[in-house]
């Protein structure tokens, strides 16, 4: 049986993912995402359409990391440099590198923004706040921009089945409401920093719209 979700481990993994010079270690980025998958799975099947895709993307990156060219995949920065210099990224249309590290991580990057926005809404929510609304608003600001209409429609329906705010606080395994809010307050700035570093790197290299 998998370990229960731990918000503390999210904090630790994303903190570990940042080097002194603000490069992002893929090993710890993946570890952070594995914790977030545990969070999604602890809420039942509502997020399965996202978590299954995330798991497959994590596996691709793990294969790169453990492969013969793994030394080029230590950080997101080294991966981008290596793949671009060796023409390993399909920049304008799907071609011979449909599962490049850059494309794979971009999908995780977009999903990370959604979770960051949702958890921030949860952190600042009140007793009468609806999780379905918070989650939908976060989705519409992020992932929805990259999904076709049918998926957006299905997602909207799925979010209607989200449990209440109390359940979300319970699955954090971080104590009472005050403790959960405090730990989210520590974790989310780290997630946001990792997101922004990646966003800036991808923007600089024109990688934000990879097919």
Swiss-Prot record:
Subcellular location: Cytoplasm, Cytosol; Golgi apparatus, trans-Golgi network membrane; Cell membrane; Endosome membrane
GO cellular component, one term: nuclear outer membrane
InterPro entries for the chain: GLTP_sf, Glycolipid_transfer_prot_dom
Gene3D superfamilies: Glycolipid transfer protein (1.10.3520.10)
Residues where an N-acylsphingoid base 1-phosphate binds: 53, 57, 103, 107, 147
Record membrane topology: Peripheral membrane protein
A single GO molecular function term of this UniProt record: ceramide 1-phosphate transfer activity
Location (main, coarse): cytoplasm
UniProt KW keywords: Cell membrane, Cytoplasm, Endosome, Golgi apparatus, Lipid transport, Lipid-binding, Membrane, Nucleus, Transport
GO biological process, one term: ceramide 1-phosphate transport
Official protein name in the record: Ceramide-1-phosphate transfer protein
